[in-house]
Design a protein with these regions (language model features):
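Aromatic- and histidine-enriched alpha-helix N-cap/loop-to-helix transition segments
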Residues: 11, 90-94, 123
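Single conserved hydrophobic/aromatic residue that forms the stacking wall/gate
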Residues: 117-127
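Structural alpha/beta surface segment adjacent to cysteine/selenocysteine redox centers
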Residues: 21-116
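Short glycine-/acidic-enriched loop or helix-start segments at secondary-structure transitions
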Residues: 17, 46, 127
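A generic structural signal for solvent-exposed, polar alpha-helical segments
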Residues: 14-15, 23, 80, 123
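Local sequence-structure signature of Cys/Sec-based thiol-disulfide redox active-site neighborhoods
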Residues: 2-19
Length: 127
């Protein structure tokens, strides 16, 4: 039986981008089927009475610094050396999420994902 993984993502999230970059190796290693589900993370934060980490942990000593260390560890562990934070972070991803939903409905979400990456240094996308 094929394992199925629902991967909820927002193009604005650097963590979602980095996780996306390792999904193919997880798929190959486990045989899992990855179901990409575009979401608006800002809407989820609002709905659940939460804030983005940059806001939530502002002023919490060393919290953001530790998150950056963990991100660097993940990047090194998975060989994602080309990753760069978008210089316009945080970005509003509403339009490209709408595009992802439309692409998913028309059956070409995978192709759309390969073309649209806010954090992809070779394809700068300014929103």
């Amino acid at each position: 039986m094929t394992k199925k993984v629902d991967f909820y993502f927002d193009f604005a999230s650097p963590n979602a981008y980095l996780s996306h970059k390792v999904m193919q190796s997880i798929k190959e290693r486990t045989g899992a089927e990855i179901n990409y589900i575009p979401v608006l993370l800002g809407g989820i934060f609002k709905l659940t009475n939460n804030k983005p980490p940059m806001e939530q942990f502002f002023g919490v000593k060393n919290k953001n610094e530790y998150q950056n260390i963990e991100m660097q560890r993940f990047i090194q562990r998975h060989g994602l050396d080309k990753f760069q934070m978008n210089p316009h972070f945080p970005v509003i991803s509403l339009q490209i999420i709408r595009g992802a939903v439309a692409a998913d409905m028309d059956g070409y979400l995978e192709e759309y994902l390969s073309l649209i990456h806010i954090s992809e240094p070779t394809r700068p996308l300014y929103i």
